[in-house]
Design a protein with these regions (language model features):
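C-terminal motif of bacterial Sec signal peptides marking the signal peptidase cleavage site
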Residues: 16-20
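Short hydrophobic segments within beta-strands
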Residues: 47-49, 78, 170
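Bacterial signal peptide processing site
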Residues: 22-24
Length: 302
C-alpha cells in the first residue's frame, strides 16, 4: 500500500511539474502581432511648412501610406533650404515668391513651382494636417522659437482653407557626430548636446502652445536607431538623412498619424529593396519607442 501511494505521489508531482512548465512556456511565448492593424486613415492630406529636413521626412511617406491601405493621399511641401521659423514668417507676410512647392498625389514627387508664395501652397488644397518645424542649426536653441512660432501659427490659422486642419510639430534630428555643418558649432559639435537642446526647445516653446495636436518625433526615432548595430550612419552628408534614415522618419510620421503601434514594415518602393530584415526590426523598434517616449533615447536591443 505504501509503495502504491509513493508511486501515485511521484506521478502527481511529475504531472504537476510538466503542467507548470507548459504553462510557463505559454505565458512567455512571444505574442507580438506579425502584421499591422488595419489603418485608421481613409485619407492623408498633409502640407509641410519646412525645408530640406521635411523633404527627407516625407520622401517615402506616400509609399508607406499606400502600402498600409490609405486610399487618398495628397502630400505638399513648402520648401526653402535651411528655412527657420523667422524666415517663414517673413516670407508668408511679404508674399514673396520664395518657395519651392513640391507635391505628391500619385506616388511621385513633382516640383509644382520654384517661385511659389506661402499662400499658394497653403491654399492649394484643403489640407487636413499642416506640419511646422525649426531650421536645424537653431532647432536646439529655445530662444530662437518665439515670437516667430506664434506668428506663423496665427498666419496659417487665418489663411488655411480647411477650418478643421490639425497642426503637428515635426521634431527634427541632431547632426551626425562627424558632421561639418557650420550650425553644429551652436552645440559645441556634440550630437548629444544638440539632441538635448531640441528636446528642451520643444518642451519650453512648442508644448506650451495649444495649437499642436501632436509631435512627429523623427529626431528621437533617428537617435534610437543610432543605438543599434546601424550606429551613427543615418545621414548622407552629416545632416541630411540617407535612405534608411528617410524610411525611419517617414514611418514615424505615419505611425503617429495612424495612432497605432507599428509591427511590420510594408513599404513597397525602391527604398524597400535596400532594407534587410534586421533593418526593418530596428525601424519598428525605433519608431514605436520614439512615439512612446518622444523626449528620451531608448537603447536598441539589436
Amino acid at each position: 500500500m505504501k509503495k502504491l501511494v509513493s508511486l501515485l505521489l511521484v506521478f502527481l508531482l511529475a504531472f504537476g511539474l510538466f503542467s507548470g512548465c507548459a504553462e510557463t512556456q505559454l505565458e512567455t511565448q512571444d505574442t507580438t502581432p506579425t502584421a499591422n492593424a488595419p489603418t485608421t486613415l481613409k485619407s492623408l492630406r498633409i502640407l509641410a511648412i519646412g525645408n530640406s529636413f521635411s523633404v527627407d521626412a516625407m520622401e517615402h511617406l506616400y509609399a508607406i501610406a499606400a502600402a498600409e491601405g490609405v486610399e487618398e493621399i495628397v502630400l505638399g511641401n513648402l520648401v526653402i533650404g535651411g528655412c527657420s521659423l523667422e524666415t517663414h514668417v517673413a516670407k508668408a507676410q511679404s508674399g514673396e515668391k520664395a518657395y519651392k512647392y513640391r507635391k505628391n498625389q500619385i506616388g511621385i514627387w513633382e516640383e509644382v513651382s520654384t517661385e511659389a508664395t506661402f499662400l499658394e501652397g497653403l491654399q492649394d488644397e484643403p489640407w487636413d494636417i499642416i506640419t511646422m518645424q525649426q531650421a536645424s542649426p537653431v532647432s536646439g536653441l529655445a530662444n530662437k522659437y518665439q515670437p516667430y512660432l506664434d506668428q506663423l501659427i496665427t498666419f496659417v490659422q487665418d489663411n488655411k482653407t480647411n477650418p478643421d486642419a490639425k497642426f503637428y510639430w515635426h521634431m527634427t534630428w541632431a547632426y551626425q557626430q562627424d558632421s561639418t555643418h557650420s550650425g553644429f558649432a551652436n552645440y559645441a559639435n556634440r550630437q548629444q548636446t544638440m539632441y538635448l537642446g531640441i528636446v528642451n526647445a520643444l518642451q519650453q516653446e512648442v508644448e506650451p502652445t495649444d495649437a499642436f495636436v501632436g509631435i512627429l518625433p523623427s529626431g528621437t526615432a533617428i537617435q534610437n536607431a543610432r543605438t543599434s548595430y546601424i550606429g551613427d550612419t543615418l545621414t548622407r552628408d552629416g545632416y541630411h538623412l540617407n535612405n534608411l534614415g528617410r524610411v525611419i522618419a517617414a514611418y514615424t510620421w505615419y505611425a503617429v498619424l495612424d495612432g497605432q503601434p507599428l509591427y511590420k514594415i510594408n513599404i513597397d518602393s525602391a527604398a524597400s529593396t535596400a532594407l534587410t530584415e534586421r533593418d526593418k526590426k530596428v525601424i519598428v523598434e525605433a519608431v514605436n519607442a520614439a512615439i512612446t517616449e518622444p523626449y528620451k533615447v531608448t537603447q536598441s536591443i539589436y
